[in-house]
Amino acid sequence: MDKPESMKVGSADDLLQLVSFNIGDEEFGVDILQVQEINRMLDITRVPNAPEYVDGVINLRGKVIPIVTLRRRFGMTRKERDKHTRIVVVELSGQVVGFVVDAVSEVLRISREVTEPPPSIVGGVREEYITGVGKLPDRLLILLDLEKVLTSEEGGHLKEVA
């Protein structure tokens, strides 16, 4: 039986290995090499005078990590956190950051051949955050550039928060 086109194995250069997660009805993918770990929701400590996009900080094994809720960052409506809510811990330009997502779906590999450049707006997410769209057999996967989700200035503010 043939594999779906998006799941065919090619050379390592032809494949993207991604962590996929959901925010609302949209499914996003980020490069697995940026992801350090995925955690269940932890208690977030609010930080006075933190930027609006920062929820606060968590203590992860003795390291203080700033937390950003992607829902808020993307201008989506708030949602109560539940048993599926996760914190995706990533490293961006030497700064460790936790992004709150509604749920983590899976780790997957897709061929670069099934990706397309981003349309101007996808699911309310601005184009500059998106590197492309992966066309899977049963759904579309929005490929995020986490380095662009926070500007370099905002990344500097995160260092101050932590």
Locations of the language-model features?
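An acidic, low-aromatic, low-complexity terminal/linker signal
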Residues: 1-162
